[in-house]
């Protein structure tokens, strides 16, 4: 076991590319500081991680562009039993802060966990700042309203292809946005989405977009989407209703 009390990484650059899935991730600079008595059976790990200019592309689609992230965490580390309990933890992505609680235990090739995370009443403009299509040089001229909330939990064991039970729920309420150069705003943005798995293989994952609606220049659009059996025999249901003049 390492006799380390203070470990640091400063101004690192990380780049990951997977040509088979057209996935790209990069960030620079990245800094990490980890404090704790790593030679003890049990210790508090004080972790601070910052990353700037984060870029993430999946399937050729830009999902993050020049985002900033910060993780501040105090972890109760039971090093003798490889069990780590999270408390007083905050992950920030741009202006969005997410709290994290729970524990993770490493057991051979398995990872057991009981985790939950969430954020409440995040400003809709802060969410738009994460989307490359919105976060351009014109972003400062964007006015936006509305709120987003998110809840995530994962419980069980991850081993090989087996996943723990998990659920991610997110909701956008009364969202709106408008660029100063455009005559009309997009209003009444209301979204309710859920991704869940009962604790099995990826094939059992359910994607349920039960509500998607907005109004633009007097035209309204509403849609729903449902998918499951994504690997073996995909099942999809979708609906759309709208008027565009």
Predicted segments — roles?
Residues 51-55, 106, 119-123, 172-176, ...:
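Transmembrane beta-strands of outer-membrane beta-barrel pores
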Residues 20-35, 61-73, 90-101, 129-155, ...:
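Amphipathic hydrophobic-ligand
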Residues 7-14, 28-30, 52-54, 89, ...:
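Solvent-exposed loop/turn tips at the surfaces of repeat/solenoid architectures
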Residues 83-90, 206-212:
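Transmembrane beta-strand segments that form the barrel wall of outer-membrane beta-barrel proteins
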Residues 160-164, 201-204:
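Short loop/turn motifs that connect adjacent beta-strands in outer-membrane beta-barrel proteins
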Residues 1-83, 193:
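Elongated, acidic membrane-bridging lipid-handling scaffolds
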Residues 10-12, 52-54, 79-83, 127-135, ...:
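Flexible, solvent-exposed coil segments and beta strand-coil junctions
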Residues 45-47, 113-115, 166-168, 207, ...:
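Transmembrane beta-strands of outer-membrane beta-barrel proteins
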